[in-house]
Structure formats: C-alpha cells, structure tokens
A protein has these predicted regions:
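Glycine-rich phosphate-binding loop of ATP-dependent small-molecule kinases
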Residues: 9-326
C-alpha cells in the first residue's frame, strides 16, 4: 500500500481535505490558536467539498516536516473533542426534529482507526439516533442475493444517522485483494455503484464517504502493538496478517475504487490518521460541515421538587452487595 503522498500520485481522485473553520463563537479557544487571540469555538469544516489538491492538504506539513510534527497532546485533544461532541449533539437534535436521513461510510486501511473514530463520534449521542452497522461475512442466502441487498435494510429512516464500519465497498477492496471475488464481478460492481448511490441521495439521504489512510510504518507499529498488548490482541485477525503483506494490492484496489465511485453526488473524503487524535478531530469537524444542521433553541429545564414520604422505611431485604474493591 502507499503512503500519504503516493495515495494521490497513483489515483486520479483529488484527495478532499476541507479546511477547518469555526462554526460559531462560543468563547473558547480553537485548536491551534495562540493564547491571547480571538476565540471562535469548535472547528467545523465548510460544507463545500473544498479545493482539489494532490497529496495531503496544502496547509499540512510535508515530507520530513510531517514526520517531525509532534503528536497532539491529550489535554488539547480532549478540549477540542468536548466542543465537537456538543456540536454532534446539536446535529443529532436537528436530525430528529427535521427527519433527516444521514448515512456515513467508513473505509480504509487496516489499523487506520475506523473503529476508534466511530467510537468517539457515538460516545456522547443517543444510540436511538446514531447506529453503527458492522456486518459479518455474508450467509449462503445473502451470497445468492444482489450484493448490496443485505446493506439496504440498515439504511437510515427519518431522524437517524447510520454509520457503516466497512460497507458494500468490501467488494472493491478486501474481496478482490484476497481472491474472494473474480475480477469481472468487481468491475461490474464498480460500474453499478454510482447509480446505486445516486438513488440513495435522490431519496433524500445525506451520504458521506470517508477513506482513512495510514502510512506503512505506522500500520506496522499498530499491528505490533496489537500483537504485544493483551488488551488489543482481540483486534488482530488472520485476515490482518494476510493483508499486511499486500500493501500495494490494496493500493491498486483503492485507486480503482476511487476512479470508479468518486462522484459529485457521493464523493470520497480522505483522512490521514497517522496521528489518531488529529485524525479524529479532523473527521468529526468535517462531518459536521457536511450536514446542514442548525442548533435548536434550548429548553429552560429545571428539576421538579422531590416529594417527601415520611412513612417510607427501608425494608430488611437480603440484598447482595458487590464487593467494594476500589
């Protein structure tokens, strides 16, 4: 597979990286601002797809400078994430109130951080609005169906945000690379997907597609971490080990996918995630810029007075309390 700059050298797609702009003033200091400058609140990307560039964003560090860029500090990361979480809640309330339908697709290299990003998107919102779909291998019955058929029942209804942790694009990535699907079926799939996604968008759905890109050295480090850390070993599969050796096969499959399925109605957005913290913030900020939400007026909520009941007495029940070890 390729590094960040090779990504666009091999592919006809122009990597889209929307510049981050403030959503509205909140009296807080945005990421990267120097002390004493005007605060503009959380960073939210413009709804525009942004300028077409080759490689990484024009304002991103290049070459050795990129490698030398220090990882974001946890304190600053959590500060910015709190602001973005508040915006995600505002987006959620707008989706519920307007009946909007939002479908988000996450694809990318193994270890690129899809699961971690999705976790940070969903950890402060309602699971009744935000729902994650991660389908397992198809059953024999599903294999006999139209390929995209098993994904359709999971599409969002009014007032829902559905996040696909991998999607119908398995047919364009892992399946051809691992030899699960013959080339003619992959070609046919790539020919049909634009029309399929056009129908999704024409039905009123907001479709957002992300590709998470991680460099080869960072991927190696993350896989070794999974091998050596008993808390992460469950993340490591035989498929990860097989695909690790096929970096450039995945690169070619990715490039073919971009060429065939990057459309004006369903474009691909590329996120560089060697720095997980920066990557997550950039993705969430960009996501907020793709949904035309407006914050709803907040209710003035006050707790009611709790009623007294002087007649109530705690019963003498044989309650089993858990040990208080901490």
């Amino acid at each position: 597979m390729t590094n960040g700059s090779e990504l666009c050298q091999q592919s006809d797609i122009a990597c889209r990286t929307a510049g981050l702009v403030s959503h509205r003033e909140k009296g807080t200091e945005p990421m990267g601002k120097k002390a004493g400058t005007k605060s503009t609140g959380p960073k939210k990307a413009s709804r525009s797809t942004g300028p077409d560039v080759t490689g990484r964003p024009s304002d991103a560090p290049q070459g050795d400078a990129a490698a030398a860029t220090p990882k974001m500090k946890t304190k600053e990361y959590e500060k910015q994430m709190r602001l973005l979480h508040a915006e995600l809640v505002a987006m959620q309330e707008w989706v519920k109130a307007t009946g909007a339908k939002v479908c988000i697709v996450f694809e990318g290299r193994d270890t690129a951080g899809k699961g971690g990003t999705i976790k940070r998107i969903t950890e402060r919102v309602s699971p009744r609005v935000f729902r994650v779909v991660a389908l397992s291998a198809p059953t024999d019955r599903e294999k006999s169906q139209m390929y995209v058929q098993r994904y359709v029942p999971h599409f969002p209804a009014a007032g829902e945000v559905i996040i696909f942790d991998r999607s119908w694009y398995n047919r364009a990535g892992v399946e051809p690379v691992m030899g699960f699907t013959p080339p003619d079926q992959v070609t046919r799939f790539l020919e049909l997907v634009p029309a399929f996604e056009k129908a999704m968008v024409d039905s009123g759905m907001i479709l957002i597609k992300y590709w998470l890109e991680v460099g080869p050295d960072e991927q190696t480090r993350r896989l070794e971490s999974r091998i050596n850390d008993p808390r992460k070993i469950w993340k490591l599969s035989d498929m990860d080990l097989k695909s690790y050796s096929r970096w450039y096969d995945y690169s070619r499959a990715r490039d073919d996918m971009f060429r065939a399925t990057d459309t004006s109605w369903a474009p691909w957005f590329v996120a560089h995630t060697d720095d997980k913290k920066r990557g997550r913030l950039n993705i969430i900020s960009h996501l907020l810029g793709q949904v035309p939400y407006e914050p709803l007026p907040q209710r003035d909520v006050k707790l009611p007075k709790r009623k007294d009941d002087p007649d109530y007495v705690d019963p003498e029940l044989p309650l089993r309390h858990i040990p208080e070890k901490f």
